[in-house]
């Protein structure tokens, strides 16, 4: 009886640990997304003006959480989404080269919808850097 209880307790502990560890990467990605959404809300309230420091700070926190998903949970299904989210945050922080490099690192491994979003953000970064024709060409390729 004691042996069976011990095995049951171990199985329960193992299940508990597995459940919460699998939730960790989702929770970290969720936090990154929350910071991004908060930053977007602040930015859009001041549209047409400089991006407020509070939004820049939230984008920075989103980048930090996204990096945590990427480094701590490299096999997670959220890695590509975290990279795109990080690049979008970098775009709004005017870190265009970082955003482009991060997106390019996953361009061949993402599915169609994410690939279109990735190309769109690369084009926006190139446009902001002053590479207008390159940005236009990328967007034209995207819609053709």
PLM region spans:
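Bacterial N-terminal signal peptides that target proteins for export
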Residues: 1-13
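Acidic, polar-rich low-complexity tracts and alpha-helical solenoid repeat scaffolds
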Residues: 2-3, 17-144
């Amino acid at each position: 009886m004691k042996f069976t209880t011990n095995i049951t307790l171990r199985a329960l502990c193992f299940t508990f640990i597995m459940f919460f560890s699998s939730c960790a990467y989702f929770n970290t990605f969720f936090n990154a997304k929350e910071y991004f959404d908060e930053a977007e809300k602040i930015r859009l309230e001041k549209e047409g003006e400089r991006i407020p420091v509070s939004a820049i700070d939230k984008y920075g926190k989103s980048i930090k959480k996204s990096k945590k998903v990427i480094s701590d949970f490299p096999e997670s299904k959220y890695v590509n989404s975290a990279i795109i989210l990080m690049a979008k945050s970098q775009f709004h922080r005017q870190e265009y080269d970082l955003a482009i490099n991060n997106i390019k690192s996953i361009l061949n491994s993402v599915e169609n919808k994410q690939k279109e979003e990735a190309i769109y953000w690369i084009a926006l970064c190139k446009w902001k850097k002053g590479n207008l024709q390159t940005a236009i060409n990328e967007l034209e390729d995207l819609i053709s």
